């Protein structure tokens, strides 16, 4: 497992398969079975909304909006392009993973000046997120006694503590969100087991759970998953 408690799979690395169909099409269900997937639909951004309690972010989710569509619409206008949505999505994950402006610009394929301006607009749109991130850094530093050579810590949704190097206190945001997502995922695996899907569980890929069920049980499995998610 990763430091945050996020599950990690190696040999083969099924969570990081190459994009495209060549490799992925090699993974098939057994005869008489099919795959049924439970998807948490942008869990990390939802956890960010929960922790930050940002009013605009919570309102967008309450309306059932796709958050990245919402950001693109607010910043670029209602006729935003696919590329502009990608930039909006990259900005959200740059916040979660602590990426600086140069990294965000490179990932989003925009210049640094444009990336800087975009992040300023993003912070204006979601001021609660900026405040939350600053508070996490401050908490880590305070718990380290203000000494950058020491460790502070962050708390996950279940109260578990994760140590964070004070010199890299910004990582506390990612640890708190990713670690909390890992807890939610594992709790959901246990819940699905209690609902009878345990024997069919095959793989957890971060915010997705993959089940291999007999064809005659596929619809029942789908209903169970929909009710539980």
Identify the meaning behind each predicted range:
Residues 51, 117-120:
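Short Gly/aromatic-enriched secondary-structure transition segments
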Residues 48, 100-113, 209-226:
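Catalytic palm subdomain of template-directed nucleic-acid polymerases
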């Amino acid at each position: 497992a990763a430091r945050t408690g996020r599950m990690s799979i190696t040999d083969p690395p099924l969570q990081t398969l190459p994009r495209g169909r060549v490799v992925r099409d090699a993974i098939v269900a057994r005869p008489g079975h099919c795959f049924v997937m439970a998807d948490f639909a942008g869990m990390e951004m939802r956890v960010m909304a929960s922790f930050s309690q940002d009013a605009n972010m919570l309102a967008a989710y309450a309306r059932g909006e796709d958050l990245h569509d919402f950001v693109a619409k607010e910043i670029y206008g209602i006729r935003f392009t696919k590329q502009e949505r990608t930039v909006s999505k990259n900005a959200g994950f740059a916040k979660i993973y602590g990426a600086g402006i140069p990294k965000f610009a490179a990932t989003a394929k925009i210049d640094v000046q444009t990336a800087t301006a975009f992040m300023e607009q993003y912070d204006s749109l979601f001021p609660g997120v900026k405040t939350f991130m600053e508070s996490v850094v401050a908490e880590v530093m305070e718990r380290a006694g203000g000494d950058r050579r020491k460790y502070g810590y962050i708390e996950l949704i279940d109260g578990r503590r994760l140590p964070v190097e004070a010199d890299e206190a910004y990582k506390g945001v990612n640890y708190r969100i990713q670690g909390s997502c890992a807890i939610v995922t594992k709790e959901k695996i246990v819940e699905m087991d209690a609902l009878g899907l345990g024997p069919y569980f095959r793989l957890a890929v971060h915010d997705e759970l993959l089940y291999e069920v007999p064809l005659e049980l596929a619809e029942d499995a789908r209903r169970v998953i929909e009710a539980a998610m």
